[in-house]
């Protein structure tokens, strides 16, 4: 399978408008994989002898886990991207390098995303959680449902105050504290600016003959085949993504991030066997009195999707219209030939019908797209109102994301049936 993956972005003040950290990710997965958006409340775990079942393996549970909102492939436990109640956001990317990829079942990168969000109230603490779990349990296993697809992982971790890039190769890793703007794609990208690292990372590279111990250590050059001297002038999605961020430096808003995620010429908005199956943008105000706001599509094709807002408040209403059906627990690739169950959630089903209408009828397609953009404009106006005023109607906010999902479904239903 061709090694295509995702793109994750972050921009920090002064690159942004309004003293806000802006996070964004496109999840590029197999074209027919359904991604759901779910909410998991905070929890206290008194029985710590009871282990936590992740996608393939069990890990030790912790006394307390935080509330999280996750965008995830519906067949697994972890998540492609998400946020927690403390404003921590994480997205991961598939990466490949010199180290052979382990197919032995361990923690998936997507499991590590969820575990980091559930267990950490700052970005750097999430980094600590992930590298500790990586050391204890390792990473590996099949990352697709019904097909062989394995990789190592890089992570972009952000909160209200800072952001980190964490890149891995097996159990070895390097981390970079972000300044200004930064993005990751499906390649290693940390070079000589290394702020934290695995204690044996350099020795291992030297033992393998990847570094002579004399030249300045370059993580990407040592652990991958990338020519880092040409990395920022190549036609790669990584390079194109950075150019899009840099183009808007000083004026980046959440709308800017949505525009970047919708960019087709760069390949960031992916089409083909690997498709942008879901997208996320988060607004993390540095003022702690203001809420963090997280926007999810829960549908593929961001240029034909609506970003809908989620805000953490007590007593969140269930996200029923973006929750996939639940099936009997089974190993994703245990049965051969493997037949995928129908994991489409209600929004996904109506969105697929609308996409067909957009493709087949120019007039109806324009009507649907116009209404979608109008709905998203209302989203943007509501977000700005909340961030400018600081006022949050909690009774309304418990239904904020579910209501916008219902409004989106109504657009599709009214035009499909007419």
UniProtKB/Swiss-Prot annotation:
- Tell me, what does this protein do in biology? Plays a role in thermal nociception.
Residues carrying Glyoxylic acid (Cys): 6
Q: Pro-sequence positions in this chain?
A: 1-5
* Protein name per the record: Secernin-3
UniProt lists the gene as Scrn3
Q: Which domain of life is it from?
A: Eukaryota
Q: Which UniProt keywords apply?
A: Pyruvate
One GO BP annotation here?
A: proteolysis
* Family assignment from sequence similarity: Belongs to the peptidase C69 family. Secernin subfamily.
Indicate the residues that form the catalytic site. Answer: 6
